[in-house]
């Protein structure tokens, strides 16, 4: 379109001067003018894209802390599965899937305890969104040696801000964190903080990555073992972003029929 300049001597000048900001002036061939709201976003600001500087990285130029390559062994046969070095590797993410009741929480809590028992300097944490204190009391009857494991019960913070609670807790710096489960933690934060599912997942995954990188008070490279729920079809419940940041995937299953004594 052409630019039309309206001077003071124009018969429409006073009418135009009285229009509110961001009104669209429609000019017709016969000279008629009307005013309307900006339905098409004609006043929307355009942003200029700055030239992007791309920096390529050579693996030889990367510098890593030696602590990243020191495993956290459990002293069990499971160490051979977790890494070639034997044990949980710092800054990694292990996803644990399995049918309900197969014993995911029990097995992983035992491994969590064994990491700390093998090296008391390693701080371990259990984040429970599935069970409350009463549920864990029953576990304690069977596994009294779990008595000193630090546990964050999200059910204790239903009237608080679970998002801030998780951030504050993880910021203390933990070597190994067991989360039960990924879906329940996300759902708790989503409901209590009025976030969308995608924003909640992005927040939690970004938080995990930051902890992997040692962005906490102790500057330790946190390893996460995250329990996943399975759908009826046997696939895990979660976003593809979770798949992409996974270091390793483990599955616990029944050996033989469901509820059999043996698992693998």
What are the roles of these predicted feature ranges?
Residues 6, 13-18:
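Acidic, low-complexity, intrinsically disordered interaction modules
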Residues 25, 39-49:
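Interdomain "pre-motor" coupling segment immediately N-terminal to P-loop NTPase/helicase cores
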Residues 52-81:
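N-terminal pre-Walker A segment at the start of P-loop NTPase domains
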Residues 84-91:
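Phosphate-binding P-loop
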Residues 93-160:
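Conserved P-loop
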Residues 95, 176-180, 225:
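Structural motif
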Residues 97, 209-264:
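Phosphate-binding/switch region of NTP-binding enzymes
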Residues 156-216, 220:
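Phosphate-binding/switch loop-helix module in NTP-utilizing enzymes
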């Amino acid at each position: 379109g052409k630019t039309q300049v309206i001077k003071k001597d124009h018969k429409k000048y006073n009418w135009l001067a009285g229009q509110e900001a961001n009104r669209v002036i429609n000019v017709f061939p016969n000279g008629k003018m009307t005013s309307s709201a900006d339905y098409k976003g004609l006043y929307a600001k355009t942003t200029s894209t700055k030239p992007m500087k791309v920096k390529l990285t050579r693996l030889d130029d990367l510098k890593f802390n030696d602590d990243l390559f020191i495993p956290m062994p459990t002293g069990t046969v499971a160490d051979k599965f977790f890494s070639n070095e034997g044990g949980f590797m710092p800054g990694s993410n292990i996803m644990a899937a399995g049918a309900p009741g197969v014993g995911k929480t029990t097995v992983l809590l035992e491994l969590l305890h064994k990491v700390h028992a093998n090296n008391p300097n390693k701080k371990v944490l259990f984040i429970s969104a599935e069970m409350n204190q009463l549920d864990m009391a029953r576990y304690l009857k069977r596994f009294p040696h779990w008595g000193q494991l630090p546990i964050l019960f999200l059910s204790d913070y239903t009237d608080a801000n679970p998002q801030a609670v998780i951030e504050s807790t993880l910021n203390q710096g933990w070597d190994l964190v067991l989360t039960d489960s990924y879906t329940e933690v996300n759902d708790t934060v989503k409901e209590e903080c009025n976030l969308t599912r995608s924003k909640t997942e992005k927040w939690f995954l970004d938080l995990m990555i930051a902890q992997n990188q040692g962005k906490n008070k102790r500057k330790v490279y946190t390893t996460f073992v995250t329990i996943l729920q399975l759908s009826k079809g046997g696939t895990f419940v979660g976003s593809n972003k979770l798949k992409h940041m996974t270091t390793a995937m483990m599955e616990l299953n029944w050996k033989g029929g469901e509820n059999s004594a043996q698992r693998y």
